[in-house]
Amino acid sequence: MFSIIVPSYSRNREVLELLESLKAQTVYNFEVIIVDDCSPQAVVIEPNYPFEVKVFRNETNQGAAGSRNVGAQLASQEWLLFLDDDDRFANNKCEVISQYIEQYPQINFIYHSAQCEMVNEKFQYFTSPIEPNKINLDHILLANKLGGMPMMGIKKSFFIALGGLNSELKSLEDYEFALKVADSPNLKAGFINQPLSICYFHTKRSSVSTNTENTEKAIEYIEHKYVKTEKQKQNFAINSLYILSYIYAMNLSRKAASYYFKIFKRSHNIKHLTIAIISFISPKLAINMKRFF
């Protein structure tokens, strides 16, 4: 039924912990494909799991997107699921999704909500994806309301037909793939309103300068490829500011406030002004507002 694709680089302990967590799945209708992205120390897995585990090692570093594409090519099952080595599936995810597919066999793409854990701040919130009938470029250019790769399942044949993930991008690969899905005339989507993935987020973990440079390049690429109408231009202008604000917000930087204020000037939404003020006063408090916004 499923091939679960896990890209990993120099995180052997996390890979082993992830595999242990998958033992708790209520059904074992899946294989796991670990794509070792040319780590200095190769991933080694002992064959003691109640499901098949395959390990493939890239000869050169391909990045997360390229490694997921490699895993997709190696997959032997009809459906692809994606999991990062520091995230988790709900214990019933594979069972719930397989039951949904049996009920709606015409679909080729499935997505669901997620439980997001803010590790340092010690709180959680849940994503709210849009309904399938609202999936279009206008909506996804305004905000990625499909989610990242751990919130998606896709038929291998559809994934290959779409060209997989863009391995040239160093940022926003998940978002660009969501736009690719939304833009496809062959999309047959299904939605499960359950948080079937648990994603962990850490503030002050990454480089602001590197992230900003890569993200700005990705934004430029996405705008050139997908923005065609005036409405799409307006929507993506707002979302681009939000994407850039997120980098600073996750690093607890007051610079996030300037981006939220720019969003407010475009949206005239008092919520954005409120977040701008809170971000300037206390970036940490602004992160905690995710509980409510």
Question: Could you tell me what each predicted segment is?
Answer:
Residues M1-S3, S21, E31, E176:
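Cell-envelope/extracellular polymer assembly enzymes that use nucleotide-activated donors
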Residues E131-E216:
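Conserved nucleotide-sugar donor-binding catalytic segment
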Residues F2-E14, L18, Q25, V35:
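A conserved hydrophobic helix/loop-capping motif in glycosyltransferases and polysaccharide synthases
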Residues L19-R57:
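Acidic donor-binding segment of Leloir-type glycosyltransferases
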Residues G66, C94-F158:
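Flexible acidic/His/Gly-enriched loops in nucleotide-sugar-dependent glycosyltransferase catalytic domains
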Residues L80:
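Short aromatic/hydrophobic "clamp" motif used to bind/position activated sugar donors
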Residues N58-A75:
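Glycine-rich, basic loop-to-helix element that forms the pyrophosphate-binding segment
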Residues Q194-T203, S207-N235, R254-R266:
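Catalytic core of nucleotide-sugar-dependent glycosyltransferases
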